[in-house]
A protein has these predicted regions:
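Conserved, structured core segments of small domains
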Residues: 1-99
């Protein structure tokens, strides 16, 4: 099984709205969930010239799942409660190679 990082990207939401449906999704994907992850707040960036910026990519949080391939991940996240919030919410998926 391959591991995939899910990055949640979208406008801020009320905590109740953004977490609705997550327990059911966790139950549905079962052992495919490697790490529930966490919300992400107060980001900043360090640039190559040593300067710091408070402007970053808007990321709401992350999770890690495992699947055979990209199609398997798409099956896992097709009904993810985050994307069901609306078209302005996206999940970016990246394969995380094992060491």
């Amino acid at each position: 099984m391959k591991r995939f990082l899910l990055l949640y990207n979208g406008p801020p939401t009320a905590p109740d709205a953004s977490h609705e449906g997550w327990p059911e999704w966790f139950d549905r994907i079962g052992g495919a969930l490697v790490d529930v992850g966490s919300p992400m707040v107060n980001g900043f960036a360090l640039h190559g010239d040593g300067t710091r910026s408070d402007e970053t990519t808007i990321l709401n949080g992350f999770s890690i799942v495992q699947a055979e391939d990209r199609d398997g991940v798409l099956d896992l996240i097709a009904d993810h409660p985050f994307v069901l919030l609306g078209s302005e919410y996206t999940i970016e998926v990246f394969e995380v190679p094992r060491k």
